[in-house]
UniProtKB/Swiss-Prot annotation:
Entry's EC annotation: 6.3.5.-
Role of this protein: Allows the formation of correctly charged Asn-tRNA(Asn) or Gln-tRNA(Gln) through the transamidation of misacylated Asp-tRNA(Asn) or Glu-tRNA(Gln) in organisms which lack either or both of asparaginyl-tRNA or glutaminyl-tRNA synthetases. The reaction takes place in the presence of glutamine and ATP through an activated phospho-Asp-tRNA(Asn) or phospho-Glu-tRNA(Gln).
Similarity-based family: Belongs to the GatC family.
Originating organism: Geotalea daltonii (strain DSM 22248 / JCM 15807 / FRC-32)
The protein's name in its UniProt record: Aspartyl/glutamyl-tRNA(Asn/Gln) amidotransferase subunit C
EC primary class: ligase
GO biological processes: glutaminyl-tRNAGln biosynthesis via transamidation; regulation of translational fidelity; translation
SUPFAM superfamilies recorded: Glu-tRNAGln amidotransferase C subunit
């Protein structure tokens, strides 16, 4: 598949990018090379190959939950600029 400068400029417009003429020419060549590589990949015979989403067949590996001692409220709030009882006090951001 061949891409031309007009198509690159259209993609840039859709992406809200402002390209100079020189950049459009450069990206035309780069995108053309990328699409040529994709065309080459499309020529591969993938019959009998199982589609995969990940290279490693691994699912989430969670550790078992275990109860631990916490650092405590006083230690957690020790470096807080402002605090109110056992809470961080932060500036109001919503009116």
């Amino acid at each position: 598949m061949k891409i031309n400068k007009d198509e690159v400029e259209k993609v840039a417009l859709l992406a809200r990018l402002e390209l100079t003429g020189e950049e459009a020419e450069m990206f035309t060549g780069q995108m053309d090379a990328i699409l040529a590589y994709v065309d080459k990949l499309n020529e591969l015979n993938t019959d009998g190959i199982v589609p995969t989403a990940h290279a490693v067949p691994m699912e989430n590996a969670f550790r078992a939950d275990e109860v631990r001692d916490s650092i405590g409220i006083d230690n957690a709030l020790a470096n807080a600029p402002k605090r109110a009882e056992s809470f961080f006090r932060v500036p109001k951001v919503i009116e």
